[in-house]
């Protein structure tokens, strides 16, 4: 088994020096050999995939949307029904257009080679305690994944917001049981899909607050939060690998503690054990998050902060051959978020600076976008011409690097 911890990654031998049962990346018989010359079915490592994923964009506020009333507190006992309780009622309930092939084709044409599809799997789910995913909701997610396959882009699906709903209400053992069941269903449904489909375990809530016996949200201790994070990440990997098919070798994205860079690069965060070598990436969000909310974008402090966050990721993961998936990256910077003494005062310029620093390290940046904010789902173009120029520049740069 291959075990990895942030800052403490072991090789393919156990503590006594005996050779462990780790695949060298070749087909070891656990994954099927496809009767096709389709390159999408060629086994690919996480390192190789990180080089090919290019720039990514999220299909945000779409398949992860759910009943908006009280959505921030999630205080309801079960998932409210939206409209006629059909997949597209949820898909559009936060204002998104119905996803089409043209929307995904446009993303590809604008320079994105990866589409992250956040999914709230609780939608249309019966409140019977079984956590059985709706077949119709699975089918709709499949349709969008198929759009990505046809467009020639990587697709990434996860458990989004539903992780928060579950973690807030259950102890660790019950969370593990539920997430194992959810990922087993998802992985079995997509077991025959090529390696261009990637699974991302969770969103941002690993290590998050939980309801106490009085119904009040309470923060976990760091010790318990790291235990939860590490346990649920291992449950995700075990569930997917246990379904066989192409999931035996599929690249998986491991979610960080809150996807926070400081917490995820701590030595207390552990990468899961896996049956195959180099099939795991780690996911964090927003390399300049605290600067954004402190209204310090564009200044010297902002630049130094980005560099320090990148240095943490390099030391903990990249230097240990663990690719980094920046699952959410700021798309636009409002003027109110800039520092008073900002040297860089243009949103597109700041986007370019961030993408430059991330891609120079080989980090996969995924732009967080909602309906027609950054990329228009009606014109199939990036909304701002300056942003469009930045994306094209880095898309071309990454494409050229692959040809070298």
Annotate each PLM feature.
Residues 121-139, 161-177, 207-221, 296-298, ...:
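Surface-exposed, active-site-proximal loop segments in enzymatic domains
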Residues 3-4:
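C-terminal motif of bacterial Sec signal peptides marking the signal peptidase cleavage site
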Residues 60-99, 127-133, 171, 291-306, ...:
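Acidic/histidine-rich helix-loop elements
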Residues 90, 94-115, 119, 125, ...:
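An active-site-proximal structural segment forming one wall of the substrate-binding cleft
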Residues 176-298, 311-332, 356, 360-363:
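Active-site region of glycoside hydrolase catalytic domains
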Residues 55, 301-303, 307-404:
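Substrate-binding cleft of secreted/luminal carbohydrate-active enzymes
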Residues 17, 22-114:
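N-terminal carbohydrate-binding accessory modules
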């Amino acid at each position: 088994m291959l075990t990895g911890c942030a800052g403490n990654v072991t090789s393919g031998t156990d503590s006594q020096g005996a050779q462990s049962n780790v695949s060298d990346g070749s087909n070891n018989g656990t994954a099927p050999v496809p009767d096709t010359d389709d390159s999408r079915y060629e086994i690919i490592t996480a390192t190789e995939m990180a080089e090919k994923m290019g720039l990514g964009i999220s299909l945000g506020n779409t398949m992860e949307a759910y009943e908006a009333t009280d959505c921030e507190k999630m205080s309801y006992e079960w998932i409210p029904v939206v409209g006629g309780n059909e997949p597209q009622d949820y898909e559009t309930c936060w204002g998104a257009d119905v996803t089409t092939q043209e929307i995904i084709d446009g993303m590809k044409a604008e320079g994105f080679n990866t589409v992250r599809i956040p999914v709230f799997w609780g939608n249309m789910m019966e409140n019977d305690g079984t956590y059985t995913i709706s077949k119709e909701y699975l089918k709709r997610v499949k349709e969008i994944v198929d759009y990505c396959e046809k467009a020639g882009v990587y697709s990434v699906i996860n458990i989004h917001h539903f992780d928060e709903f579950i973690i807030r209400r259950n102890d660790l053992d019950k969370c593990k049981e539920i997430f194992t069941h959810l990922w087993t269903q998802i992985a079995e449904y997509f077991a025959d899909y090529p390696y261009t489909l990637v699974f991302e375990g969770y969103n941002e809530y690993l290590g998050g607050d939980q309801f106490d016996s009085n119904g009040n949200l309470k923060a976990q201790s760091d010790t318990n939060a790291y235990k939860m994070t590490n346990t649920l990440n291992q449950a995700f990997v075990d569930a997917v690998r246990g379904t066989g098919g192409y999931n035996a070798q599929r690249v998986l994205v491991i979610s960080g503690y809150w996807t926070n860079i400081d917490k995820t690069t701590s030595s207390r965060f552990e990468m899961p054990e896996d049956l195959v070598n180099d099939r795991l990436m780690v996911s964090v969000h927003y390399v300049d998050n605290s600067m954004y909310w402190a209204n310090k974008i564009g200044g010297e402090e902002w630049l130094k902060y980005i560099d320090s966050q990148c240095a943490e990721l390099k030391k903990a993961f990249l230097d240990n051959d663990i690719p980094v998936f920046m699952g959410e990256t700021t798309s636009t910077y409002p003027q109110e978020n800039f520092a008073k003494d900002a040297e860089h005062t243009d949103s597109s310029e700041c986007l370019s600076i961030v993408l430059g620093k991330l891609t120079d390290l080989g980090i996969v940046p995924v732009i967080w976008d909602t309906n027609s904010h950054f990329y228009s789902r009606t014109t199939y173009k990036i909304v701002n011409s300056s942003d469009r120029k930045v994306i094209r520049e880095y898309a071309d740069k990454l494409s050229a690097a692959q040809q070298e």
